[in-house]
Amino acid sequence: MATNTSVYRLWQLISPNLPVGAYSYSQGLEQVIHTAKITDEAATMNWISGVLEHGLARTDIPVLLRVYYAARKGDDEGALWWSRQLLAMRETAELRLEDLSMGAALLRLLPELGVPVPASELPFAAAFAIGASAWNVDPTDACAGYAWSWSEQQVAAAIKLVPLGHTAGQRLLLALGERIEGAVTIASGLDDEELGMSLPGLAIASARHETQYTRLFRS
């Protein structure tokens, strides 16, 4: 049986077992559920798919692509420049902290797995791109995998918080999976000056979550 180790490395990067603490964050989802703006499966789908298509597709994923190609060329300065652009797109301290915390965790892990990393703090998408590039993961597959991993974490949070049953969670993942190719296509077609998107609802939810009295997820 022929094997493609780059596929397995992608599975490793998107695994819930990757020790970067992704399970600790809800990206504002906890707050909108707390205020009863999301109460069922349909509303959960509307929120997550909206952030995927209007947020990740125009921020994280296109930056991931640019850092991937910079890493392929050994262009640490280019990778760092795009990383800073992504951090500048974060609209709250909570979202920035999450990004840097997960990025730092992956940057600590990658050298233990034989992947050299630049001596800079990077957001998670950039660290992910460096790992994917080093392991020769197809760039389109890397983008789709990143989007899937993010979607899976959001659904896991919703299952706990709404709450939703696990069958509902699987229906959500099935539906979100059908949106990922479109999100990657959007991201792949953006010119540099087109990157970036403001999501006021997400920004407000994240800012309010920072001071929410009781919460399961980090801020």
Language-model segment annotations:
Residues 1-219:
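Metal- and O2-centered redox machinery and metal/ROS homeostasis
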